[in-house]
Amino acid sequence: SELLTPLVNGLAPHVDLWLAETQSSIAEARAIHAGLPKDGKPFWLSFTLKDEDTDEVPRLRSGEPVADAAEAAAQLGVQVLLFNCSQPEVIGAAIDAARATFERLGAAIQIGAYANAFPPQPKEATANDGLDPLRDDLDPPGYLHWAADWQARGASHLGGCCGIGPEHIAV
């Protein structure tokens, strides 16, 4: 709240919607939501996913199941739930889990995705400890393959995160 309040107060007169981006846990999303003004502006929420050691259940970086995150998003009144800054390979299952949760709840929440182009990060990696290479297979046609899959699974908002540029979006 000490860090969030001045940011929100400064941005409030200038934004059309609120986006809590690259959240790694449900608690983070709830904390951001609690710090937003009750101004009627749409609230979009984007989670980052666990890329490594995945089991059959898509998970946030915190280890929480995406289905639980989707249920929390519905409770928070989110208009769009997105998945970003993750490997494209894990996003499809997250979309499926979110869509199934929203259908079960009868929630009309849109879904979106925007992956990054970095190779998988080791568990011991730290933020900003160097430059990451970009994956060769995620050139514009390679990224289009993933975006088409996400759209087929029900994503209506598509974009790109780190390493995905305008040339990717143009295709």
Label every PLM stretch briefly.
Residues 1-171:
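Domain-level signal for soluble alpha/beta catalytic cores
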